[in-house]
Amino acid sequence: GILAGFQTNRFTLNPRVADLIGTVSPGVSFQVGSEEENYLNLQYQSDNARYFDLGVSPAPMHRIQVAGKYDNQSRLRMEGTHSTEFVSSFMGGWVNLGRTLVDRWTHNTMGRVTYDSSDKTDLYVSGSRNYINYETGVNLYGNDGWRANVGASYKPTARISMFVEGGYGLTDFIRSTSALGFIPTSHVYGGFVGVRGQFTERLEGTIGGGYEIRDFPDIPGASFSIPAANISVSYAFRETTKFSLAYTRRTDNAAQIARQGVTYDTTSLNVQQILGTTGTWMAKAGVSYQGGSFDSLTAFGAAFDPIAGTTLRSLSLRTVDYKRDDSMLSLSGGISYMPRRWLRFGLNYAYENYSINYADAGLKEVFLPTYDAHRVMVGVQIGY
């Protein structure tokens, strides 16, 4: 595929910035079998980008993905995915570093094995591993975490399953620079109950809720727990119109500061509309909001306190509270045209607003930039 874009307001700590971005992404995909039955798929893609006004060309980005499914047509089913990526790009949100290109490796693996113990019940085990490692010298914590779940389902009807599951996981934190403090291994425990399946002729999805505990055994007072949720439903308003709603609530550790817990709440709503009767035109639109509540954490450090009656700040060394609330609002919309199976054209717009509110006035608008970003992307995709 070939992608060209225009982006404004990328870095609010500097004057308004706009740039023309070009991306060429060759790739290849191999598949054995059909996704409706048993299959194995391998994909590779290389993204080559250029920021023309900034005169910056990030290192070529490489993406590999493997996905598969096996069903013995009796009682056993297995499915899983794995992706490995080398990415070199600017980063936004609560890991944004302003005008800095950041190289990083990521690995993400998910798998599930299900055994039908009867016509109405099944047992399953699932697992995941998430890994991210930033280049040396970046003041962000990477992590290497895995989680395993054991669950069971019961079908009161042919289309609906009620489930209960419990899980346990570990997260090791990776320091990209010695300036970052050491964080011991974090343990996470949780349990969910819920329902999934085809609720009506038009409504399907998963609705689950439970409780999650993130524990730092070697750090007194650093453990915390929250009610957790995982909701994902879709509604087919018409054959040509589909709405999707998702909400998740989960725990994590802050990427910038050792021992600081964070709770993320993410909500998204998307709509997909096929235009006309030929199926070659499609429009999409979406809105999402992610809030991050970072726990109170006091430490001795630098603060830039406002000077009353002026716009100036004074540097002081004192006890500061790193408690903060972040929010990310994203809007998107686009239209695509697919005159052939091997040819697709697209025009897309995206808006992103990131804001941060520190409890301590000496930290506000200093360490993390807030920003608005507008992106207009035009692309063509060629291939089978």
Enumerate the language-model features and the residues they cover.
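Gram-negative and organellar
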Residues: 1-384
